[in-house]
Structure formats: structure tokens, C-alpha cells
């Protein structure tokens, strides 16, 4: 690992922490600690009585978090998915008392830039793609056993790849001769199977995204994490989510919109009083936030980021 794989420019740093409306004595959750960019700014805004709980699946992120926890007693980090933040909040006695939850989705720069993690098609490395290399099935093992139809479905549904069937067929044909173990090898086969290259985008981009999302169950974790965050928040607490592709943002947008609408439309129209259980649970705060020109210039990876903010009503 090189120094470059340890560097990470936090996307929408100031905007996200501002969206949390941090109180000095509040209790906050950073569901995606990463290299601690957001967490450090939250801690800077917290007073002596404030608390911050960080989550991450990545062992290297946990090592960084433990070093920060050793420096600052207000911070604790746990090696769990943010999908499990509800359980952790119950264990720690803070369920329904959390002042804000931040989720910065996707893969961090250190993960992408470290060839040994197997996320990138630009640098050759073991074909892994797991956020936590000690848990679950690697990309190589999944590709070695998955049916052609399943591979095509994953590339189409999670990678939004137009040529999913063609790519899946090429992968299966090639693995019959030799198994895939390296990212460059898979990227080459996927690239050759893509007949319409998009300008400025590697032909393997969407396929790699789809496999990574599937291997890590990212969308399932997101759905669980949003539900858990809502329950963990106190009334008036903020939920801030940064997404990096349309699949994530669609889930976040629909969740917030649904919770902001409530379920009064399921009741008889002539009902004089709407029961509390059918009232909205969230209030949308402002419009979606995107990276500004200065951030886009400093960090091109921020170009696809979109941030949404909501506040708990009940």
C-alpha cells in the first residue's frame, strides 16, 4: 500500500456537517467512517458532552477510527455495516436519542486506489471487491460459480449495463478455459464484450460497479440503514445521505419522499382526524445539494455526488 491509497478527499464535507445542524451536546452517528473526514469535523463542532459513533466494514478504516478514538474520548468506532446501526443504538442505549445520522455511500478513494482490494479496473489486483475482506464471497468466487443469467442480471440491475447479456456470455465462455482471479483480466474480457464505448468512461465501469454492489449487498444495506436511522433519530434529528449513482439516490429519494408524505391516503377520505401512525415522519430540508465548481476542480470524483437532508418529525 502506498501513501496515495491512504489519502481521501471527503466529498461535500462542509455541506454534510452543516446539514446535520450539529449541537454541542448532541449524539451523532457517522455510518460510513472511511478515513474520518466527516467525523473529525463533527467532533470539532461538538462540545465536551457530545458523542459520535462511527461505523465501517473496512478493516483499514477501523484502524484509522481506533486511532482517532484513542485521541478523543467522545468518539467510538465499530466494525459493522451501517445497516446494523439500529441494533448498535439499542445496545448502547441511544435508540431514539440520536441527533443526526450521516451516510456517505459508495467506495472511498483509498479502497479504489489500492489494487489489493480489487475494486478498480484501472490497476491490476486480486479480484475481491469486498468492503470487509474477511466476510462474504469475493467477486472471483461469485463469478466462478454464478449462472450466466445471474451475472447478466447483476450487470443490468446494479451496473445499469446495456450489454449485460453479451458481457455475461463472454465471462462464462472465458471462465470455462481459465478462472478469473485478477481485476485486469476481468476488465479486459468485459471491455472486449462492450461494442459501444462511452466517451470518457472505461467500458468496464458499469459492470465493475454492478459486481461490487452485488458482492457487498450495498442496496439492501442502504434500505435497512435508512429504516434503522429513522428509528434511531430523536424528534428533530437530521438524516444526511450522500449518494454517488442513480440506484442509491433513487432509494434515498423515494424513502425520504415516502416518509415525508405519510400514509394518510390509505385512510377513508371522510375521516375527521388522521391517526398519528399515518402522519409524516420526515420533513425534507432544502433541495438536493451538489458539489460546487471549486470542489469539482479539486476532486473530480465528487461530480456524481448528490446529498439529501431530512429531519425527523415523529
From Swiss-Prot:
GO molecular-function terms, A-Z: rRNA (cytosine-N4-)-methyltransferase activity
EC primary class: transferase
Domain of life: Bacteria
Subcellular location, principal: cytoplasm
Presence of keyword Methyltransferase: yes
InterPro entries reported for this sequence: RsmH (IPR002903), SAM-dep_MeTrfase_MraW_recog (IPR023397), SAM-dependent_MTases_sf (IPR029063)
GO CC, one annotated term: cytoplasm
Biological process per Gene Ontology, one example term: rRNA base methylation
EC numbers, comma separated: 2.1.1.199
Localization in the cell: Cytoplasm
Catalytic activity: cytidine(1402) in 16S rRNA + S-adenosyl-L-methionine = N(4)-methylcytidine(1402) in 16S rRNA + S-adenosyl-L-homocysteine + H(+)
Keywords linked to the UniProt accession: Cytoplasm, Methyltransferase, rRNA processing, S-adenosyl-L-methionine, Transferase
Binding residues annotated for S-adenosyl-L-methionine, in chain numbering: 36-38, 56, 82, 104, 111
Function: Specifically methylates the N4 position of cytidine in position 1402 (C1402) of 16S rRNA.
Family according to the record: Belongs to the methyltransferase superfamily. RsmH family.
Protein name according to UniProt: Ribosomal RNA small subunit methyltransferase H
